[in-house]
Amino acid sequence: MSSFPTVLVIGAGLAGSEAAWQIAQAGVPVRLIEMRPIKHSPAHYSSECAELVCSNSFGALSSDRAAGLLKEELRRLGSIVIRTADSHAVPAGGALAVNRASFSASLTKELSAHPHITIERQEQEHLPDEGQITVLATGPLTSELLAENLRTFTGRSECHFFDAASPIIEGESIDLTLAFRASRYDKGDADYMNCPMDKGQYLAFREALLNAEQAELKEFDKESAKFFEGCLPIEELARRGEDTMRYGPLKPIGLWDPRWGDLNDRDVRRSKRAYAVVQLRKEDLEGRLWNLVGFQTNLKWSEQKRVLKMIPGLHQAEFVRFGVMHRNTFSKPRSYLNQPCSSANDPTSSLLDRSPAQRDIPLQ
């Protein structure tokens, strides 16, 4: 029997799973509350802990980049999330990407086996009574009842934005006579699938995106729809200007198909280089599944099939998951949190962020 009071961690996403593990590793008992599969969010597909809803990439690996340095620090601090990600990594050039299914399944198994962690599958509808040491890590997809309770607790109105996920297709349906494998600037192995476009193909694709039907938002969301600027739907990028996509996720720089000729020949390079390139990243080691990088979208599923098949090499694409958009709830912590992230109303309650700096954050 532990002499420490039990800590309540609400939410078994990335932040909640890490918090529960670190607390338990210190010998403190933890109740980890997760509402799935009793109640699912609009974007989750499984009941596993730390399910990756959007990208399967954790960003740069190299420690000369800020994201890579942060991961190395977490590694040295014994992070279960980073350790599990390393164990389930898939080739992704200079990035740490994972097989999202085996990653979350493995992490769930470790959490379930920890002697100091009890996982309870139920919806937490309100904050616990004052005095209960609590970590709130429910993330941007916090259930409505708990979000309403938090608004009452903080005295702050709800803030929200819209986020989206990218489609995933079967690798065997990619036409390799048009697509090619390469990593940008030839860094590391040829881990990405690349679908090059000439100017005419790019402009036609953009026009199709602009005219495609989108999934309907609820009436109360239409007037206040805001997007997360770090993860904009591809159709929103298309709306922002003719060249926005090709200076963003479709940028062609650093990508060359050897079939085009000698990259060092200036005339060949000028005549053959792509106007834009769509990249796909592996979802598993075998390359059975690939996700379209930067292609989070709110298009209707039928429109996704029609428009995305215009991409050279994807004309026979078989979709295993379509892109979806969902409403994210976030908090403005500066107005009601002390350092480090404890509530001014109840110092025994804390909110966790996935990011290294405290700012306007999802409830995670």
Swiss-Prot record:
Segments of this protein annotated with the region Disordered: 335-364
- InterPro entries, per database record: FAD/NAD-bd_sf (IPR036188), MnmG-rel (IPR002218), MnmG_N (IPR040131), TrmFO (IPR004417)
Pfam families annotated for this entry? GIDA
| Gene Ontology BP, a term | tRNA wobble uridine modification
Which sites bind FAD?
G11, A12, G13, L14, A15, G16
> What cofactor does this one take?
FAD
Reaction(s) the record says it catalyses = uridine(54) in tRNA + (6R)-5,10-methylene-5,6,7,8-tetrahydrofolate + NADH + H(+) = 5-methyluridine(54) in tRNA + (6S)-5,6,7,8-tetrahydrofolate + NAD(+); uridine(54) in tRNA + (6R)-5,10-methylene-5,6,7,8-tetrahydrofolate + NADPH + H(+) = 5-methyluridine(54) in tRNA + (6S)-5,6,7,8-tetrahydrofolate + NADP(+)
Keywords, in A-Z order: Cytoplasm, FAD, Flavoprotein, Methyltransferase, NAD, NADP, Transferase, tRNA processing
Q: Main site of residence?
A: cytoplasm
Localization terms from the record = Cytoplasm
Highest taxon listed in the record's lineage? Bacteria
Record's PANTHER family?
GLUCOSE INHIBITED DIVISION PROTEIN A, METHYLENETETRAHYDROFOLATE--TRNA-(URACIL-5-)-METHYLTRANSFERASE TRMFO
Q: What does this protein do?
A: Catalyzes the folate-dependent formation of 5-methyl-uridine at position 54 (M-5-U54) in all tRNAs.
Name-wise, this protein is Methylenetetrahydrofolate--tRNA-(uracil-5-)-methyltransferase TrmFO
- Give the source lineage, highest ranks first: Bacteria, Bacillati, Cyanobacteriota, Cyanophyceae, Synechococcales
